[in-house]
């Protein structure tokens, strides 16, 4: 019997109701359904100065999810998709995203498309698009103190009421660079339309094999975002006396202390997105972020 996963944002009533409808219709068609909550992918915030439960990113995989699963349907907003990515990438289960949230930048379908979605799932009418992920590790000496998988970005920044930060960033074999800013963002192409975009970074199309380093509020006219090969590991050394906050995809993170370093590298586990139709990235940019809309001149004031 084919098996399909359901990953649901249990905090959204609409997502829960839709999950019940989907599960009923899939089971009537002879499909086994394994349901999980998206909260399982929300690692939360941890303090490396205290005892840390380091389980590795494989620990987020829900019970019953494995490589034999045909796909997992994700019900929620973009935050739910980021959590689901962390839950499914280690076992390479493809995800079909249905938006029940707000922006839905990562959504493949909407509730109005539900009948079509079910039909295409049952008839196996879909393709797979892979998106790269990152492994983000906090290291102290030879010890890994914290680790998580990231689809969008890692952001390392100062706490409130503290001074501007200084970072030494080593990219692969290249000479380290010094950055003075409120923080730094290391993003994938998928994450280039998220926090990195707000920090002034460029939009990167998903198929480009690159990563992006973007400073947050840099205190320099010459400090700009940098795009480089995703084959290069990145190490960020805090050059500041204050502890810093690190947040990964908005739902995981920890404190980083002056004696720590953050290692970011491309993961061997991409997120596999189910596509029901040709995915036109520039159309998504236009519809969701207003990119390329024609300029309409404002009338002169009387």
UniProtKB/Swiss-Prot annotation:
Enzyme's top EC category? transferase
- Record-annotated active site: 78
Q: InterPro entries, alphabetically? A: ATP-NAD_kinase_N (IPR017438), ATP-NAD_kinase_PpnK-typ_C (IPR017437), NAD/diacylglycerol_kinase_sf (IPR016064), NADK (IPR002504)
An annotated Gene Ontology molecular function:
metal ion binding
Catalytic reactions of this protein: NAD(+) + ATP = ADP + NADP(+) + H(+)
For this UniProt record, give its keywords in alphabetical order, as a comma-separated list.
Answer: ATP-binding, Cytoplasm, Kinase, NAD, NADP, Nucleotide-binding, Transferase
Q: Which Pfam families match?
A: NAD_kinase, NAD_kinase_C
UniProt-annotated location(s) = Cytoplasm
Q: What is its EC number?
A: 2.7.1.23
Q: Name one GO biological process term.
A: NADP biosynthetic process
Query: Which domain of life, per UniProt?
Result: Bacteria
- Per the record, the major location class is cytoplasm
> Does the record's keyword annotation contain Thylakoid?
no
Q: Which residues form a coiled coil?
A: none
* PANTHER family for the chain: NAD KINASE, NAD KINASE 2
The function of this protein is:
Involved in the regulation of the intracellular balance of NAD and NADP, and is a key enzyme in the biosynthesis of NADP. Catalyzes specifically the phosphorylation on 2'-hydroxyl of the adenosine moiety of NAD to yield NADP.
Q: Which family does it belong to?
A: Belongs to the NAD kinase family.
Name-wise, this protein is: NAD kinase 2
Record organism: Prochlorococcus marinus (strain MIT 9313)
Q: Which gene encodes it?
A: nadK2
């Amino acid at each position: 019997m084919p098996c399909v996963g359901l990953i649901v944002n249990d905090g959204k009533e609409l997502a829960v109701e839709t999950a019940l409808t989907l599960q009923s219709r899939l089971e009537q068609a002879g499909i086994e359904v394994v349901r999980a909550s998206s909260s399982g992918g929300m690692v939360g915030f941890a303090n490396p100065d205290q005892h840390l439960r380091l389980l590795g990113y494989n620990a987020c995989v829900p019970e019953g999810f494995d490589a034999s699963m045909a796909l997992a349907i994700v019900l929620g907003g973009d935050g739910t998709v980021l959590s689901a990515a962390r839950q499914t990438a280690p076992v390479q289960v493809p995800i079909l995203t249905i938006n029940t949230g707000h922006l839905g930048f990562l959504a493949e379908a909407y509730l109005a498309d539900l009948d079509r979605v079910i039909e295409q799932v049952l008839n196996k009418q879909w393709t797979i698009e892979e998106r790269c992920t990152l492994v983000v590790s906090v290291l102290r000496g030879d010890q890994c103190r914290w680790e998580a998988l990231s689809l969008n970005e890692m952001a390392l920044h100062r706490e409130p009421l503290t001074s501007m930060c200084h970072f030494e960033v080593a990219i692969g074999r290249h000479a380290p660079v010094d950055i003075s800013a409120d923080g730094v963002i290391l993003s994938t192409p998928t994450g280039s339309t998220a926090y990195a975009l707000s920090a002034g970074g460029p939009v990167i199309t998903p198929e480009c094999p690159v990563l992006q380093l973007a400073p947050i509020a840099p205190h320099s006219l010459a400090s700009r975002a940098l795009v480089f090969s995703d084959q290069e590991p990145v190490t960020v050394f805090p050059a500041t006396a204050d502890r810093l906050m690190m947040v990964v995809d908005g739902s995981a993170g920890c404190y980083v202390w002056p004696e720590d370093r953050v290692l970011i590298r491309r993961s061997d586990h991409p997120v596999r997105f189910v596509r029901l139709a040709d995915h036109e990235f520039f159309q998504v940019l236009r519809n969701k972020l207003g990119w390329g809309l024609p300029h309409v001149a404002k009338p002169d004031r009387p």
